[in-house]
Amino acid sequence: MKKFIAAAALSVGLAALAAAPAFAALSASVKAPEFVAQASLAGKEFTFKLSESLKKGPVVLYFYPGAFTPGCTIEAYEFGEAMEEFTALGATVVGASGDDIAKLHQFAADNKACNGKFAVAVASPADIKAYDVAGRAETRSNRTSYVIAPDGTIMSTLSSGEPTGHIANALLALKAWRERNPITPAAATK
């Protein structure tokens, strides 16, 4: 009887894992889709355009499920704390979720989240689909970070439900890219 119960529990557990959404994401070395969205930096609205930001250097575009959820708040805070490192590497950081712009204004300015240090943008269902980050609902993404080179090629992808690890992974990818593409005095003055 105990073996039967153990086998049944194992079967239920495996079925639950099979039913859980798998994190699919765009692979490294593919071109990132254009991303144009309403965004907020420190509570101030603007239009974010990936192709324009890439003219200035690499972009870390990270998708998260929802503003003010525990994991997303931790992740945003950690990105904010690392902004000096991202800036030194010439990178722009922007978070994206299916939240509306009013909520993102609050999240962008909140000192326990973005703290005004980087922008967050509204990811439409089409954006979520294009970046292959759909969560349980088409308006919510899973937690996926993309590091995108100035030519629009994805250098690194990390899909993980854990809020930790995304910042370190992005910084490693940017440091490796920067070693191959050093900042020259002429480039620094542009």
Regions found by a protein language model. Name each.
Residues V94, F107-N142:
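Short, internal strand/loop/helix patches
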Residues M1-V12:
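Bacterial N-terminal signal peptides that target proteins for export
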Residues P33, P58-V60, N142-T144:
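Short loop/turn microsegments at loop-to-beta-strand junctions
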Residues L50-T73, Y77-F79:
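Short active-site neighborhood of thiol/selenol oxidoreductases, capturing the structured segment around
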Residues L14-A39, P185-A187:
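N-proximal helix/coil linker or "cap" segments that precede and/or mark the start of modular domains
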Residues R140-K190:
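Thiol-/selenol-based redox modules, centered on thioredoxin-like
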Residues V36-P58:
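A short beta-strand-turn-helix
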